[in-house]
């Protein structure tokens, strides 16, 4: 990108730092040509090329239905401080559940250090499940004055 109004392409280390500083975004899913975006908390593991998240599911979860039918997900993470100061990162790839027994203790500890808490409203049973987004494509653009 050469036009400064459209920002600059971020380097890999800038993207990783931004993802782990923000640690929240919108996970975009699709089912029968319908899109569904959900706010999530995550931790980005550059060495493993993945974003890890601990998702909550209610009994009749629309989220689960969409996850089961989505081949490729998209995670959008952004910060907007003004028209001339913003950052946007998109992570796309396959999405799969991770058995909690397969997660090493240091990975879950790291997740809880990096990811931001999102409280789930009381009043129903919520089942927590680990998922990972395999980062097959990662891009970031930023504009600073």
Question: PLM ranges: what are they?
Answer:
Residues 56-58, 69-77, 85-96:
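Active-site-adjacent structural patch at catalytic or cofactor/ligand-binding sites
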Residues 1-21:
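Extreme N-terminal tail/first-helix region
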Residues 83-145:
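Charged, gly/pro-rich active-site loop segments
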Residues 56-61, 111-115:
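Short, solvent-exposed aromatic-acidic interface loops
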Residues 22-58, 75:
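Short beta-strand segments
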Residues 48-50, 72, 94, 137:
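Structural motif
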Residues 64-68:
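Surface-exposed connector loops and short turns at secondary-structure junctions
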């Amino acid at each position: 990108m050469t036009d400064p109004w459209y920002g600059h392409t971020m380097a890999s280390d800038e993207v990783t730092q931004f993802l782990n500083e923000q640690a929240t975004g919108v996970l975009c899913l699709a089912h029968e040509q319908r899109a569904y975006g959900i706010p999530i908390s995550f931790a980005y593991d550059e060495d493993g090329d993945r974003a890890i998240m601990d998702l909550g599911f209610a009994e009749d979860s629309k989220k689960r239905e969409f996850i089961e039918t989505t081949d490729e997900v998209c995670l959008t993470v952004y910060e907007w401080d003004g028209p001339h100061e913003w950052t946007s990162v998109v992570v796309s790839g396959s999405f799969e559940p991770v058995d909690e027994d397969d997660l090493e203790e240091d990975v879950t500890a790291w997740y809880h250090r990096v990811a931001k808490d999102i409280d789930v409203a009381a009043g129903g049973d919520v089942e927590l499940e680990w998922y990972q987004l395999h980062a097959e494509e990662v891009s970031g653009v930023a504009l600073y004055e």
